[in-house]
């Protein structure tokens, strides 16, 4: 998300658009505050307005309070975070929500949906999600084709304050297992992630060419 913010700030030198950053505190004790601090620091340095939201204020509870009622904490976290981001963007009058999803995130999500047989979610993948409801703000993913390692390398080379720690709940998720599998195989077979992404893009192209009726 921090790299996305820096990239969009740079694009303002060439394109005329307003930019507002949004942070969401899910309520994970001992973890989330580091990310919030990094968001505040980067927004101040870039002179970008930062709107801070939290599960506690917007939804009435912290993720720590409710995660035990779900198979994975990622389930409620994703739902409520997306809802808060969309509501905030709608209230701000934004035309787009730009997220920090990178190549690794995308192929993990793709394989998760494939493993679950949830082919309906395929339409939600890709660098841009079109309007599907008047109150849902379209999403863009500027880093869609950028590997996670390159994002980390950029931050180190440019001395950017980012939060690299893994979420303490992530190890319980299917995503964590798939991420580990992909990273292990990338070490053995370099380029496997890019190959999966290329296959993924072909599937999306094929799917879009199929008549709906």
List each language-model region with its residue ranges:
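Catalytic subdomain that performs nucleotidyl-dependent activation
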Residues: 86, 105-187, 192
